[in-house]
Protein backbone atom coordinates (compact mmCIF):
# COMPACT_ATOMS: atom_id res chain seq x y z
CA UNK A 1 0.00 0.00 0.00
CA UNK A 2 1.36 3.39 -0.93
CA UNK A 3 1.86 6.19 1.50
CA UNK A 4 -0.51 9.15 1.25
CA UNK A 5 0.91 12.57 1.99
CA UNK A 6 -1.73 15.10 3.09
CA UNK A 7 0.31 18.11 4.09
CA UNK A 8 -1.25 20.54 1.60
CA UNK A 9 -4.82 19.32 2.15
CA UNK A 10 -4.36 19.55 5.91
CA UNK A 11 -3.01 23.08 5.68
CA UNK A 12 -5.89 24.15 3.42
CA UNK A 13 -8.43 22.58 5.80
CA UNK A 14 -6.87 24.28 8.84
CA UNK A 15 -6.77 27.66 7.11
CA UNK A 16 -10.41 27.29 6.07
CA UNK A 17 -11.52 26.53 9.63
CA UNK A 18 -9.33 29.25 11.17
CA UNK A 19 -10.70 31.82 8.69
CA UNK A 20 -14.24 31.00 9.81
CA UNK A 21 -13.27 31.77 13.42
CA UNK A 22 -11.87 35.25 12.87
CA UNK A 23 -12.88 37.57 15.67
CA UNK A 24 -13.32 34.86 18.30
CA UNK A 25 -11.68 35.56 21.65
CA UNK A 26 -8.43 34.01 22.85
CA UNK A 27 -7.32 30.64 21.57
CA UNK A 28 -10.69 30.08 19.96
CA UNK A 29 -9.48 32.04 16.95
CA UNK A 30 -5.92 30.73 16.72
CA UNK A 31 -5.70 27.19 18.14
CA UNK A 32 -7.05 24.59 15.74
CA UNK A 33 -8.63 22.21 18.27
CA UNK A 34 -10.34 24.96 20.23
CA UNK A 35 -11.45 26.65 17.01
CA UNK A 36 -12.98 23.43 15.70
CA UNK A 37 -14.97 22.89 18.91
CA UNK A 38 -16.10 26.52 19.02
CA UNK A 39 -17.27 26.41 15.40
CA UNK A 40 -19.23 23.20 16.01
CA UNK A 41 -21.00 24.81 18.94
CA UNK A 42 -21.62 28.03 17.01
CA UNK A 43 -23.15 26.14 14.07
CA UNK A 44 -25.33 24.10 16.43
CA UNK A 45 -26.57 27.27 18.14
CA UNK A 46 -27.17 29.01 14.80
CA UNK A 47 -29.28 26.07 13.58
CA UNK A 48 -31.31 26.01 16.80
CA UNK A 49 -31.85 29.77 16.85
CA UNK A 50 -33.00 29.91 13.23
CA UNK A 51 -35.80 27.53 14.22
CA UNK A 52 -36.54 29.59 17.35
CA UNK A 53 -36.72 32.80 15.32
CA UNK A 54 -39.29 31.27 12.98
CA UNK A 55 -41.40 30.10 15.96
CA UNK A 56 -41.21 33.59 17.42
CA UNK A 57 -42.35 35.24 14.18
CA UNK A 58 -45.24 32.79 13.87
CA UNK A 59 -46.37 33.75 17.39
CA UNK A 60 -46.16 37.46 16.53
CA UNK A 61 -48.12 37.03 13.29
CA UNK A 62 -50.86 35.00 14.97
CA UNK A 63 -51.13 37.58 17.77
CA UNK A 64 -51.53 40.39 15.23
CA UNK A 65 -54.23 38.50 13.32
CA UNK A 66 -56.02 37.55 16.53
CA UNK A 67 -56.06 41.19 17.63
CA UNK A 68 -58.26 42.13 14.70
CA UNK A 69 -60.31 38.93 14.65
CA UNK A 70 -61.34 39.19 18.32
CA UNK A 71 -63.40 42.28 17.53
CA UNK A 72 -65.59 39.96 15.38
CA UNK A 73 -65.68 37.22 18.06
CA UNK A 74 -63.62 34.93 15.84
CA UNK A 75 -60.26 33.45 16.71
CA UNK A 76 -57.29 32.32 14.63
CA UNK A 77 -57.99 28.59 14.80
CA UNK A 78 -61.43 29.02 13.20
CA UNK A 79 -60.02 31.13 10.36
CA UNK A 80 -57.19 28.64 9.85
CA UNK A 81 -59.72 25.81 9.55
CA UNK A 82 -61.76 27.88 7.08
CA UNK A 83 -58.69 28.62 4.94
CA UNK A 84 -57.69 24.98 4.82
CA UNK A 85 -61.16 23.70 3.90
CA UNK A 86 -61.67 26.25 1.12
CA UNK A 87 -58.12 25.73 -0.22
CA UNK A 88 -57.23 29.41 0.18
CA UNK A 89 -53.46 29.92 0.06
CA UNK A 90 -52.88 32.77 2.52
CA UNK A 91 -50.17 32.26 5.09
CA UNK A 92 -49.82 33.85 8.53
CA UNK A 93 -47.33 36.44 7.35
CA UNK A 94 -49.56 37.76 4.56
CA UNK A 95 -52.63 37.87 6.81
CA UNK A 96 -50.61 39.68 9.47
CA UNK A 97 -49.43 42.31 6.98
CA UNK A 98 -52.97 42.76 5.70
CA UNK A 99 -54.30 43.20 9.25
CA UNK A 100 -51.76 45.99 9.86
CA UNK A 101 -51.68 47.87 6.55
CA UNK A 102 -55.14 47.18 5.10
CA UNK A 103 -57.62 46.17 7.82
CA UNK A 104 -60.57 46.99 5.52
CA UNK A 105 -59.54 44.16 3.20
CA UNK A 106 -59.40 41.76 6.14
CA UNK A 107 -62.84 42.94 7.26
CA UNK A 108 -64.21 42.09 3.80
CA UNK A 109 -62.57 38.69 4.08
CA UNK A 110 -64.12 38.13 7.53
CA UNK A 111 -67.57 39.14 6.26
CA UNK A 112 -67.16 36.65 3.42
CA UNK A 113 -66.29 34.01 6.01
CA UNK A 114 -69.37 34.87 8.13
CA UNK A 115 -71.64 34.75 5.05
CA UNK A 116 -70.21 31.37 4.10
CA UNK A 117 -70.99 30.08 7.58
CA UNK A 118 -74.57 31.33 7.36
CA UNK A 119 -75.13 29.40 4.12
CA UNK A 120 -74.02 26.10 5.66
From Swiss-Prot:
**The keyword rRNA-binding appears for this protein:** yes
**Per the UniProt entry, what is one GO biological process?**
translation
Q: Does the keyword Ribonucleoprotein apply?
A: yes
User: May I ask which residue range the UniProt record assigns to the signal sequence?
Assistant: none
Say which domain of life the source belongs to: Eukaryota
**What is this protein's function?**
Binds directly to 23S ribosomal RNA and is necessary for the in vitro assembly process of the 50S ribosomal subunit. It is not involved in the protein synthesizing functions of that subunit.
Tell me the PANTHER family matching this sequence: 39S RIBOSOMAL PROTEIN L20
NCBIfam families, A to Z: rplT_bact
The protein's name: Large ribosomal subunit protein bL20c
Q: Which organism is it from?
A: Helicosporidium sp. subsp. Simulium jonesii (Green alga)
The organism's lineage?
A: Eukaryota, Viridiplantae, Chlorophyta, core chlorophytes, Trebouxiophyceae
Amino acid sequence: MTRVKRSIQRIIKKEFILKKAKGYKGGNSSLFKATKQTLLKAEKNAYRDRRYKQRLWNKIWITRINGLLRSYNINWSVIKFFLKNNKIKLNRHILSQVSIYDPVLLQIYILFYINTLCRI
